[in-house]
Amino acid sequence: GIRNISAAAYLRLTAPLIRYRLHGIHRDAHGRVICPNRVVAKVSRVEIARQFFSPPPEKLLTRLIQNGDITEAQATLARLVPVASDLTAEADSGGHTDNRQALTLLPTMIGLRDETMARFNYTDPINLGLAGGIATPEATAAAFAMGADYVLTGTVNQACIESGTSDLVRQMLAEAQQADVAMAPAADMFEMGVK
């Protein structure tokens, strides 16, 4: 089965996401909670990160029990684990973005993660990465210097030959400077005014 998924652009947690995360949750021979399915969340807002750092909401657990999707025993174990096993803080990026600055977003998310881990006494660490605007080795080094456990790149990968895009597009991206980009309406959310 699929053991790792990426959960991006969520505004709130959903029952299918929680069902996936909890599928197969159990205690091992040493009593340790094992949650075989991993959710890697990508968020740019603190209130959304808080949901992913926390255990699943009781309302969703109740619904999943009533639907026969999880057992009472699984719901009990669910209260001991975060929804996300890893979380990527998405700063200003080339896709849908909330225009967050990496210098303020990552430290805020690290603080929230640490606070939540202490509050719920999690035994496994929640890895925290950074995405958005990471296009150079220096930007990658800066992310790690600020405390990121990993980085996630996106648009910069379109400049690679493996991207399958045209030579012209790859050349334009490789030559682009910071001042050469601007926000534009998002094609799939144009009617809502999203950039």
Please report, for each region that a protein language model flagged, where it lies by residue.
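Catalytic or ion-translocation cores adjacent to nucleophile or general acid/base/metal-coordination motifs
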Residues: 6-7, 11-14, 92-93, 108, ...
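Active-site entrance/lid segments in N-terminal catalytic domains of soluble metabolic enzymes
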Residues: 1-125, 138, 157
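Glycine-rich beta-strand-to-loop/alpha-helix junction loops that act as flexible
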Residues: 1, 127-135, 153
